[in-house]
């Protein structure tokens, strides 16, 4: 129990515990034990203590090692030199072993002594962790000026005239959450000040400061520790200083201090600065005149640095990054983060590029109870003139971006994804540090409003595209698109009534000017006389128009525990109002005359109505079985799907948003082989399939296998523009390819996924893939991916000829300089691995090869060193880069090579090599999961 001092004596609230009474004026100057007295607050505000029992003489005060001896002799001088404490500056960034061989004075606990819970929070390559010992008052949040002070010691002496108490032997003082420990202490009552000597430790809320001597202000908690070492347990941070000052607000200031996240026995890296400030309240630190030292060797200097000491956000400079490339030359990025409020922030990315100048980029992020999003922008006055003569290039380069998701209420949702750029080469020449901004051929400029009712969904969508390439044709914009889809809220007689409705306006502004390459010459690679690729679009495919589609349906689902049967009737009606330019009208007449079976004619108003009838059915069987000594429940799930869609001539309808889907097991049970609304495939087929699964008692699905085939009773006449079904063997075949899917999960770490489609007519593989993935759940550092894919039935639009290509397809036509046979055919393997070879060393590799064109798409190899406080990656990489210097896709495919170095100082962030993260994340499956769980 502790006694609190009277209000007018609060300035020095020392309390008596079961240890020693320190500050009561005593009649004698010799040492007495606190247990021998009963103490009460006197009327004068002091302590009134009376002995319980007679006082016995206590043994003399012990003499501690390192105590001062009389000077004046050589022996005394030698002893003084020998007993001089080792300075922290002599440790060169390591912990002082003179204080403890095992660094236990820093609360360091070796890995083998950690509990299971502590190991789970410790990095796999860390030799231990800083564990704060449990002590009284750790969670005390009482303000210092209201907290009593508890003191324990073995012996004490009080000098009444000087009002000085001397404590010796395991001295412990505690006030609130703060605790001070020492071998000896002098407490000055009049000044509320204490002097601590020998093995000094000051603890407070996850921090520890260790030193030889300390001055402490007892009423505020301010302290100065000489020859200090410090630890911040949760952040794995330690360091040292000639002296460390702890303020009343718990801020730690270090003179000639160091900062590192390395283990006590390692000096792999450290920050060394004249003045270092660590603020646990904000989670950040600052330092001036700072050198970054590796193995105590200075490698980098900055007059000022602002760095995190935990995972909280705070305004300040983020770690800079620098790199070099042929496009930019030397590049330096010095991000500055603005922590404006808990729910919004901003980041500025000044990017200096030796070949291009200074690019200013920034982003603003926000979060509200019902929405989230970000604004971003960038600007560069580009001084590089490599593209100055190329069409569409602008030297005043900019980018703006807005991403938003939110809800105006629980039913009404809003969405914005808008990016605009100055020229189509922006992302090819420049990078972006903004989160969520991706480089792609066409950038979204989309806004949507969605309302979700109880049985329906209504959506207003405006979706345009901004071209980030000149090697693709201009796509259609939806300006706007309105949809209403739902079901009737009641089911009379068990019937389900559903509906799909859409009204959309499709527009695009086709370009018809000439194109010049970067040398100022006409680009003859993809069009006649240097014309745009848009000039290759022919006939009614050049039309703009409005589309109205209504598709009500009625179904009668019958379900039971052993199976299901669902007949369904759907009626699709579509109305088009079209506009076509003069070139399109002339092309349409010529094409329709030359090949009336593949091309249609132009009509400003076109309609189409198609009934769709289907019957979907399936059964469910299961049994208990065993496999390789394990018990399973095996299922057998046969499925039969009949589809009838009569033929409707649709050659007069342009393609606004429609393509043909690739064949797979799932496609056997779809009611349309086309995506989008502009084509509804005629069908009279019966699809048969069966799936079997092996399920363990705990619900884990060990493996599954599916096989199926469709039987056709009529040829499929509806095709994409320019394709005559009589030239496609697969459109006239009586059966589809066999579709197989097999997945095996060895456990939760290993999995194998495959699909295989075999054509019985040609007795050849139509498509297939196999992918093996290994990543242990308890050790995600190990990754192995091995895959192969083959596809000989791709369907693609060739922008150089303005025609659709099926069955692989060539690029261009024979005789053209850019002609490539089977350009769209896919035959590739992909292998990637991240694997530990010895402790802390991992090998990283990837090889992606295109057998169709006998070329390597990407190859990289290197190593990673990872320990408790820093990480290094060195990777040699070759890849196919795409840079639009012409309109012909193959001409823009250039092999590139680079050696990439990444250094991460844990606790500071990446120093160099941030680009390494992006290509590892995109190229190696499982890499992101690995990094998310990394220490």
From Swiss-Prot:
Biased amino acid composition, Low complexity: 65-79
GO term, biological process aspect, one: lipopolysaccharide transport
One protein family per Pfam: LptD_N
Keywords: Cell outer membrane, Membrane, Signal
Coiled-coil region(s): none
Disordered: annotated span: 52-85
Compartment(s): Cell outer membrane
GO cellular component: cell outer membrane; transporter complex
Signal peptide: 1-33
Top-level division of the source organism's lineage: Bacteria
Subunit-structure text: Component of the lipopolysaccharide transport and assembly complex. Interacts with LptE and LptA.
Family, per entry: Belongs to the LptD family.
Function comment: Together with LptE, is involved in the assembly of lipopolysaccharide (LPS) at the surface of the outer membrane.
Protein name: LPS-assembly protein LptD
Natural source organism: Pseudomonas putida (strain ATCC 700007 / DSM 6899 / JCM 31910 / BCRC 17059 / LMG 24140 / F1)
Gene: lptD
